[in-house]
Each structure stands twice: as C-alpha cells, then as structure tokens.
Swiss-Prot record:
This is O-methyltransferase 16. S-adenosyl-L-homocysteine binds at residues 195, 219, 242, 262, 276. Pfam families: Dimerisation, Methyltransf_2. Its EC number is 2.1.1.-. Belongs to the class I-like SAM-binding methyltransferase superfamily. Cation-independent O-methyltransferase family. It catalyses: dopamine + S-adenosyl-L-methionine = 4-methoxytyramine + S-adenosyl-L-homocysteine + H(+). One of its GO terms (biological process) is methylation. Pathway: Aromatic compound metabolism; Alkaloid biosynthesis. The active site is at 280 (proton acceptor). It comes from Lophophora williamsii. GO terms for molecular function: O-methyltransferase activity; protein dimerization activity. The keyword Cell cycle does not apply.
C-alpha cells in the first residue's frame, strides 16, 4: 500500500502534476505563488489580533509549553462566540508561519496535542513599549479603507496617469485629513508612534543636534519629534512647521513654537532644518522647490537633516529591501509623486537645490540620517 500523505501537506504531489499541470519540479514555486496571492491575509489577521488584545496577551506569555492556548486566549478576551478558540488558533497559526509569534505543540492526555502561542522577536514591535508606542497604529493606517480604496485605481493610473488616491478621493493625501476627522486621528496616531520610536533610536546614534540653537522641523505634525529632541537638547529652540489644519491641534510643548504655513512657499529660518519622511512624499520637482526654500532659510554653513530610506539600485530579496520596495509603491499610490530614492538621487536633488555635499551619517531603524550641507 502506498504511504498516506494526507497528514503531511508537503507531500501533495499526485502523478507528477498538481493543480492543473504544475509539475513536481515546480512544487516550491507554486507554493510560493500561493503565498503571494494570499499575502493580504497577514496584515488583516495581525491587525485583528491586535484589536482583540490577543497579541498583547501572547507577548506577555511565556515561551514553549508556557505559552497560551487558544482556549485560554478566548477566555482572557471574554469572547462570547463558542468557536472563538478555533478561530484564534487558525489566525495565530498564520502569524506563527511568518514568525510573528512562536508556536509549540504540547501533548494532551488523550494522545493528541494543542498549540500554545508565545512571543517571537518581532511580536514586541506591534505592542506598546515603555513609551506606549508601537507599529500597530501604522498597520491600522496602511489597511484603513481610505488607503485600501486607492489600490483599485493603480492600473488606471498606469495607463492614463494621475495619482490613485486623488482619483478615488478627489484630493491629495495631505488635503484629505482636513475633511475626515476619523482618518486624521488614525494618521496622526500612526505618525506619532513611529516618530517616537525612530527618533529615540536616531538620538542614540546621531550627534548632529548638539551644536544647533534653532531647529526647524518641516512637516513636523503635532510636534512630537521636536519634543523628544528638545528633551535631550534643552538649549535648542524648536519651530514645528506644518499645514495650518495640522498645527492647530498641536499641544503646547516647552521650547517649541508651532507655525502654520506651506513649505512650498517658504520655510522658517533656523540654524538647521529637520525633515523626517517628507521628501519621500513628493515628486522630484516638489522636492527641489522645497529644498530650495530650505536653502534660502539657512545661514552659511547651515544644513538640512533628512531622515529617509535609501532604496537600492537593484532589487534584493532581503526583508529590508522588500519593505522599502513596498513602501515605494505605496508612496506612488497614495501620495502626490511620492517615491523612495537611492543615494545618488538624494545627492542629485540636494546639489540641484544648491547644497554643496550630502553626508550619509548613520542608519537607525532602517532609516538613514543624511546631512545636506550648504
């Protein structure tokens, strides 16, 4: 009798072909294709476990057999659905296949086993840290219906031009929050959490703020980045510069002045100008206009401190390269001309705006700190 392959899904080859003619040699390829076509499942499941509080519980659990069973998790979140434990088990199994959580099979008295879930290294990225921030709000933003709807217009944008987000919503992504308070709150929370996390890592490595007296944060949102910077460097006078509808909601921060305006018209003067994830939002023409305004606002020997990703010239298969390539297409879909840039592209932009040189100083949380020197 032929061996039973049912219990091992990897042994699913029948008569040298599967699923309409994919050959044995293509088994791994087909499996990868199946993963790609269902890749939207991962962020949706992850977001649901975050909203349910399940990921937080898993992060607090022990590892291996000390992890939490689906039944325990269902009880802890007080789910009324009798099928909740089965649903959670299936959801967490997906996360375990991506190493978002860990999973251990523990034998049961009836000769079977139950899966118990605990934290993996990346789990902590999606639960609040000591500052109460995580990547969870950014995930919530990425899968929000406002952004998801834009993808339906990507093909049309390729064929006919235009920005997918604008085609759906009738305005660009930085105008939209002013007319949608719900989305504005989601956007601001995502920016706050990611900014707080990354700026702390930057301050641990980057020492370029030590001699600055007046620092302008262009596109600084509600001023949280300047709050963190000025907490470490209290001698700095901070100017938080953003659109009027943004700064009107900004809280009072000691040593920080909130200024509303249009960065494509002018930029407040300072010893240095800080821009985090601003250049990647805009086209080369818009960035050139902005950088020229920055150049005018700086004294001799002043500099722009820009925090951005550096995309590689050739595609790579590392997690970093995939993340940056995905972000690049997200910028293309959601933002007015947004893109991730190579080092050469940043150097070209800076020099076209009049800056003498670009220094790539350090990398923190996958983002490069660059100095554009006047």
């Amino acid at each position: 009798m032929a061996p039973n392959n049912v219990d091992n899904p990897q042994n699913c080859v029948v008569n040298n072909t599967i699923n309409g003619g994919v050959g044995v040699d293509d088994e791994e390829t087909y499996g990868y294709a199946a993963q790609v076509l269902n890749s939207c499942v991962l962020p949706m499941v992850l977001n649901a476990t975050i909203e349910l509080g399940v990921l937080h519980l898993v992060n607090q659990a022990g590892s291996g057999p000390d992890g939490l069973s689906p039944a325990q998790l269902a009880a802890l979140i007080q789910a009324r659905n009798p099928d909740a434990s089965v649903m959670l088990d299936r959801m967490l199994r997906v996360l375990a296949t991506y190493d978002v959580v860990s999973c251990t099979a523990v034998p049961t008295e009836d000769g079977g086993f139950e899966r118990r879930y605990g934290p993996a290294p990346v789990t902590k990225c999606f639960v609040p840290d000591e500052d109460g921030v995580s990547l969870a709000p950014m995930l919530n933003l990425v899968i929000d219906k406002v952004f998801l709807q834009s993808w339906s217009k990507l093909k049309e944008a390729v064929m006919e031009g235009g920005i997918p987000f604008n085609k759906v919503h009738g305005m660009h992504a930085f105008e939209y929050p002013a007319v949608d308070p719900r989305f504005n709150e989601i956007f601001n929370k995502a920016m706050y959490d990611q900014s707080t996390h990354i700026i702390k890592n930057i301050l641990a490595k980057y020492k370029g703020f030590s001699q600055i007296q007046q620092l302008v944060d262009v596109g600084g949102g509600l001023g949280h980045t300047l709050r963190v910077i000025t907490s470490k460097y209290p001698s700095i006078k901070g100017i938080n510069f953003d659109l009027p509808h943004v700064v009107e909601h900004a809280p009072q921060i000691p040593g920080v002045e909130h200024v509303g305006g249009d960065m494509f018209e002018s930029v407040p003067k300072g010893d240095a100008i800080f821009m985090k994830w601003i250049l990647h939002d805009w086209s080369d023409d818009k960035c050139l206009t902005l950088l020229k305004n920055c150049y005018k606002a700086l004294p001799e020997n002043g500099m722009v401190i820009a925090v951005e990703t550096n995309i590689t010239d050739q595609p790579e298969t590392t997690a970093y390269a995939r993340a940056i390539s995905q972000l690049d297409v997200s910028m293309m879909t959601q933002n007015p001309g947004g893109k991730e840039r190579t080092r050469r592209e940043f150097e070209s932009l800076a020099k076209s705006a009049g800056f003498a040189r670009v220094d790539f100083v350090c990398c923190a949380s996958s983002f490069w700190v660059m100095e554009f020197h006047k």
